[in-house]
């Protein structure tokens, strides 16, 4: 499949999608927990950031490869979207132009798309926030685009340092964006749920006043590293 990265002039109509209840569960667990649970992989570069706060989405990836400064394939991709999808877009070479604005967002909302992840720029940012259309982007840029060059829809692509396949699960919130492979969804969900349960137990202990030093049994390791305590600064004199 890696040989398909960068191919243009192709639209794949049918993609695998994970069961919605699994996607929703991963979304509730959040980016940080999912990222840790799957071995700290799948996290997009921190340059791709939310343009809003307090919003979390999780959905199936519809992937879009676009040419620099050209948003033609967005319009092609809209037709392939289903409710619960997340559009994942990357340019074939670096570009920060404003590929996406409120008109395309309106079209995607009408299809039930939850949000956009783009390794490039968007514009109409305040309107997008007012609409409640969630966006994670590399840039906010009023510079517009043209419609001349073919890209692809639903082929594998590299987005902000991560390989994304159509149908992979995209989890996005204030902490960033993480991708879960379609075939690993069940295992990652189980691991993330276990992690969340463990963290809740630790949270209760911390709230009761117990120290992380003791919960995580850090003292022996700190001592082995040479950490020492003194009662007063004057104890270090001489």
Swiss-Prot record:
Q: Which reaction does it catalyse?
A: 4-hydroxy-4-methyl-2-oxoglutarate = 2 pyruvate; 2-hydroxy-4-oxobutane-1,2,4-tricarboxylate = oxaloacetate + pyruvate
Q: Name one GO molecular function term.
A: oxo-acid-lyase activity
Which cofactors are required for activity? Answer: Mg(2+)
Q: What happens when the gene is disrupted?
A: Cells are unable to grow in gallate.
Q: What is this enzyme's class at the first EC digit?
A: lyase
DNA-binding as a keyword of this entry, yes or no, is no
Name the GO terms of the biological process aspect: gallate catabolic process
Assigned protein family:
Belongs to the LigK/PcmE family.
How this chain assembles, per its entry, is: Homohexamer.
Cited function: Catalyzes the conversion of 4-carboxy-4-hydroxy-2-oxoadipic acid (CHA) to pyruvate and oxaloacetate, the last step of gallate degradation pathway.
Q: What is this protein called?
A: 4-carboxy-4-hydroxy-2-oxoadipic acid aldolase
> Which species is the source of this protein?
Pseudomonas putida (strain ATCC 47054 / DSM 6125 / CFBP 8728 / NCIMB 11950 / KT2440)
């Amino acid at each position: 499949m890696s040989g398909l990265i960068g191919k243009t002039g192709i639209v794949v109509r049918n993609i695998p999608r994970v069961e919605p209840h699994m996607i929703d569960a991963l979304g509730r667990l959040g980016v940080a927990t999912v990222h840790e649970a799957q071995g700290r992989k799948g996290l997009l570069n921190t340059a791709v950031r939310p343009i809003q706060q307090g919003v979390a989405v999780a959905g199936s990836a519809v992937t879009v490869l676009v040419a620099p400064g050209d948003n033609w394939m967005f319009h092609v991709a809209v037709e392939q979207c289903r409710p619960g999808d997340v559009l994942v877009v990357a340019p074939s070479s670096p570009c920060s132009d404003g590929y996406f604005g409120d008109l395309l967002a309106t079209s995607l909302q009408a299809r039930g798309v939850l949000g956009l992840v783009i390794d490039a720029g968007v514009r109409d940012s305040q309107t997008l926030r007012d609409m409640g259309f969630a966006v994670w982007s590399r840039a906010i840029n009023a510079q517009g685009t043209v419609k001349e060059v073919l890209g692809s829809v639903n082929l594998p692509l590299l987005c902000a340092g991560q390989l994304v396949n159509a149908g992979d699960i995209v989890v996005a919130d204030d902490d960033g964006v993480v991708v879960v492979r379609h075939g690993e969804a069940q295992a990652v969900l189980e691991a993330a749920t276990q992690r969340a349960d463990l963290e809740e137990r630790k949270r209760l202990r911390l709230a009761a006043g117990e120290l992380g030093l003791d919960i995580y049994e850090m003292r022996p390791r700190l001592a082995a590293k040479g950490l020492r305590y003194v009662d007063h600064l004057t104890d270090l004199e001489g």
